[in-house]
Amino acid sequence: MLTKTIDTEAWSDRYRNEAIDVPGRRVLITNFIGTEQEHDLSEPANCKGFGRVRHFHRRRSTNWLANPLPIDPACRALGMGNAATIRAQVFQNAVCNWRCWYCFVPFNLLNANKRHSSLLTPAELLDLYLADPEPPPMIDLTGGQPDLTPEWVPWMIEELQRRDLTKTVYLWSDDNLSNDYFWRYLTDDQRAAIKGYRNYGRVACFKGIDRKSFAFNTAADPALFDAQFDLFRRFVEFGLDMYAYTTFTTPDLDGSRAALSDFVDRLQRIHPLLPLRTVPLEVTVFTPVQSRIDSRCEAAMANQYVVASYWQEELVRRFGASDFSKNICDVNMK
């Protein structure tokens, strides 16, 4: 784990400069061959090493809550009915401005490492994707932190449109809510293209339930925990199809019940129904995580199950049975 607090603005600026070629419309994409992350892939890397196929499962653990993301939004958009799993073609940008100790990506794949990445255009990525004998119905733009290179999404949308793939491919991206680059660097037309693209969904991750757990998880300034809510609110008010993840790892449980209640309050101040579009993620140990874990991390992984029980209690207190029976896509925040 990092012991010094990350200068998020400085890291964001540095990694953006290394990870995007705006005139050439290229983004720095990880190549998984020969990396530590390759050991955790359920299938060999594809797309000449620049891609991986991920199988999203609604329920991976009997000890944790079901996760309908991105299965339900993708199936709804593509008319695929209900499903327990979905295959996705994953492309991973090679930079991140935070260092979450539980991240399944090795830290040396988050620092614009040119030994394991190359600058590629969306056209080149789609060429690789379409060369697969069975291209998955969904493309997942992940990282890293994709929003250090926010142009990646509208560029990919343009390329999908050019190839007449808009009705057969669902596009998904994630965001760690660490910067305002969506607003700072995209043009009005690019933002409008994202908003107007029917088969696109976006998930953003809240990295803890309070400032203490946030700083512990990310190594970032605790004040940026509050900024996460402001950034998410802007996306909702803009009209994107937004979903949320959250992690419940906290180094101790002192005050955690009250902190969790306040966390849900803050979600509801963005929109009263946002907790129903928020999915807690279970933190487990992937290969790169093993060398980072100390006693505080072990405690945090145990504590997440207690906090998850508080989460369930809060939702039962605030919502009715009819709310819980809804498909997550039918929780309307617009």
Task: Give the positions of each predicted feature.
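N-terminal [4Fe-4S]-dependent radical SAM core
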Residues: 13-92, 101, 105-110
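Acidic/glycine-enriched edge-of-secondary-structure segments
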Residues: 103-115, 215-222
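Short strand->helix junction
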Residues: 110, 146-147
